[in-house]
């Protein structure tokens, strides 16, 4: 046993030599101790032969393990001694510099006292606002992550795509039924979406840094070096959007009043799934707005005078202009222009930004962002962008917009929409509007403190489509929330087979609930299966002769979008600009 243990220790040390009776590997040692043990090879297990293993271990010479251990101990002692010396040196230096640090801090504090009280208060207010905004953003991010399944925009996953086998089953009975949430986070800082400096971290120059002498006096019509926009200055018709887009070109743009809040309306049941004139008018207005924004961006980028970098109007409004060119990580070159301004009394600060971007592989982009804030706590932001690109030889076009505003009292609203088209005929669109006010605000019957509206549609280009609408609201009633809503959706394949379904619901503050759901199964036979039920005991299930109607293709598709995007198609490639 001892002999076997000696062999194992020698093998672990790595200075071993094996002799199996056939081959012997030689190694020179100044002195060695031999351990011999009988070993049975694999062949001996079969009765063929046996062998002997010999282990030779050296403990002398220049590379013995005893010397290596001694060197390691010495090295460790030296390292500890060096660390003690270094600590002593730092301690001595710290004592010497303590007096210098105190004098330096005193000088810095004296410089702070030299700044006026008003300036210090202004900086502190900005810091408080920034920290509060960061805290709110973090809280919203947490809420969004917890409710990611409920607050997702557009179509949630590919399971909702139209297939050739859409039938009336319990599984698709819930298809398109969108979960309701209360808070939807807005798009935060513009740094991730727009080029150039960020508005929310900007502070206008103060005091002697800017004066009427330093600024170039300009006449009021040239206050902002842009041309009038005949589209945006048109009188709004009755069919226009209820939330007007801000425009720095309109006569009201620099009156610095917050756009009106979306009306708090009672949710009504959609009895018909055909597109209403309101929906068609809304989409038409969105297209006009997109075209007007594209014209404005192109006009600003082409007409601004590079020599004019700042100015002041007759009424004391001051503005600054900055331009730049950025290259994105994917090779896209972006050219942007930014105009910032502040009223004469310093109450309102705003920023308008425009940009165009392109590469040499077919990508083009136009965009604008308009932001503002005032001394009463009102803030607002309007973002718009359209782009076109090619993927596997197919042209894609995309349009998106995001309007958001919040008052100093905490009232908040947002409106977002997104559209995507490609040359194969596929298209997808969605929009989402919401608002919230202080829950202690008194309201008329049927109105709410929190209100949402979503709609979306998706076309596969072959005759299949999916559409949905979802409205819901919440009202604070003293010690709880009353909630109600209405939604419907439809899902059809190219063979006109599919399902239409909807639900109207209500939920009281004490958890009492009521709902009525309905559905229609279409199989292309000329008969429609209609069914439904309610929590109050209603129930129906019947088949009626009825033709199937649904939208196979969008009334505004890829070629309409392509023809209307004149300014976007005119954006030059980087190689054409040089």
UniProtKB/Swiss-Prot annotation:
- Keyword presence, Oxidoreductase: no
As listed in the record, the transit peptide stretches over 1-56
Source organism, top-level taxon? Eukaryota
Gene Ontology MF terms: starch binding
Region: Disordered, residue numbers: 146-166, 187-206
Query: Could you tell me the keywords of this UniProt record?
Result: Chloroplast, Plastid, Transit peptide
Under InterPro entries, the record lists: Alpha-glucan_binding_chloro
Consequence of gene disruption? No visible effect on starch and sugars turnover. In the double mutant esv1-2 lesv-1, starch is more rapidely degraded during the night.
Task: Give the induction text.
Answer: Accumulates at the end of the night, but fades out during the day.
Recorded GO CC terms: chloroplast; chloroplast stroma; cytosol; starch grain
In UniProt terms, what function does this protein have?
A: Binds preferentially to highly ordered alpha-glucans, such as starch and crystalline maltodextrins. Involved in the organization of the starch granule matrix, thus influencing starch turnover by modulating the accessibility of starch polymers to modifying and degrading enzymes involved in phosphorylation, hydrolyzes and synthesis, including starch synthases (SSI and SSIII), starch phosphorylases (PHS1), isoamylase, beta-amylase, glucan water dikinase (GWD) and phosphoglucan water dikinase (PWD).
Q: Which family does it belong to?
A: Belongs to the ESV1 family.
Q: What is this protein called?
A: Protein LIKE EARLY STARVATION, chloroplastic
Name the species this protein comes from.
Arabidopsis thaliana (Mouse-ear cress)
């Amino acid at each position: 046993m001892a002999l076997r243990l000696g062999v194992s220790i020698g093998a672990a040390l790595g200075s071993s030599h094996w002799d199996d009776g056939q081959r012997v590997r030689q190694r020179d040692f100044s002195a060695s101790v031999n351990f011999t043990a009988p070993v049975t090879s694999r062949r001996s297990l079969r009765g063929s032969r046996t062998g002997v293993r010999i282990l030779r271990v050296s403990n002398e010479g220049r590379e013995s393990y005893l010397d290596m251990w001694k060197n390691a101990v010495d090295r460790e002692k030296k390292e500890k001694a060096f660390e003690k010396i270094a600590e002593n040196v730092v301690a001595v230096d710290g004592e010497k510099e303590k007096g210098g640090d105190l004098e330096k801090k005193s000088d810095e504090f004296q410089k702070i006292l030299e700044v006026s009280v008003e300036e210090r208060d202004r900086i502190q207010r900005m810091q408080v606002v920034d920290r509060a905004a960061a805290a709110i953003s973090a809280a919203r991010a947490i809420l969004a992550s917890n409710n990611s399944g409920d607050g997702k925009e557009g179509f949630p996953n590919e399971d909702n795509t139209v297939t050739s086998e859409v039938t009336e089953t319990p599984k698709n009975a819930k298809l398109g039924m969108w979960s309701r949430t209360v808070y939807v986070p807005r798009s935060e800082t513009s740094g991730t979406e727009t080029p150039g400096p960020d508005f929310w971290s900007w502070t206008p120059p103060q005091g002697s840094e800017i004066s009427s002498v330093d600024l170039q006096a300009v006449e009021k019509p040239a206050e902002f070096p842009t041309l009038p926009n005949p589209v945006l200055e048109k009188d709004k018709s009755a069919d226009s959007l209820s939330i007007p887009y801000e425009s720095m070109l309109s006569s009201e743009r620099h009156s610095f009043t917050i756009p009106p809040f979306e009306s708090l309306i009672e949710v009504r049941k959609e009895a018909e799934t055909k597109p209403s004139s309101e929906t068609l008018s809304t989409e038409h207005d969105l297209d006009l707005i997109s075209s007007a924004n594209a014209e404005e961006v192109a006009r600003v980028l082409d007409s601004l005078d590079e020599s004019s970098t700042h100015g002041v109007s007759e009424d004391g409004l001051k503005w600054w202009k900055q331009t730049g060119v950025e290259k994105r990580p994917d090779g896209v070159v972006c050219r942007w222009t930014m105009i910032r301004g502040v009223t004469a009394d310093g109450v309102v600060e705003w920023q308008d930004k425009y940009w165009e971007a392109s590469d040499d592989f077919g990508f083009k982009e136009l965009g604008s962002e308009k932001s503002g804030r005032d001394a009463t706590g009102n803030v607002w932001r309007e973002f718009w962008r359209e782009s076109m690109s090619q993927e596997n030889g197919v042209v894609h076009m995309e349009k998106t917009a995001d309007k958001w505003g919040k008052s100093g009292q905490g009232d908040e609203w947002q409106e977002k929409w997104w559209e995507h088209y490609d040359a194969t005929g596929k298209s997808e669109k969605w929009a989402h509007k919401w608002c919230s006010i202080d829950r202690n605000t008194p309201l008329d019957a049927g109105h709410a403190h929190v209100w949402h509206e979503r709609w979306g549609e998706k076309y596969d280009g072959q005759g299949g489509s999916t559409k949905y609408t979802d409205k819901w609201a919440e009202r604070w009633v003293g010690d709880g929330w009353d909630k109600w809503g209405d939604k419907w959706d439809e899902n059809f394949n190219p063979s006109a087979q599919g399902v239409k379904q909807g639900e109207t619901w209500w939920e009281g503050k004490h958890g009492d609930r009521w709902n009525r759901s309905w559905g229609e199964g279409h199989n292309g036979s000329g008969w429609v299966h209609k069914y439904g039920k309610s929590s109050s005991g209603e129930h129906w299930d019947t088949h009626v002769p009825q033709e199937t109607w649904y939208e196979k293709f969008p009334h505004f598709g890829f070629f309409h979008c392509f023809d209307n995007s004149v300014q976007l198609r005119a954006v030059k490639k980087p190689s054409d600009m040089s």
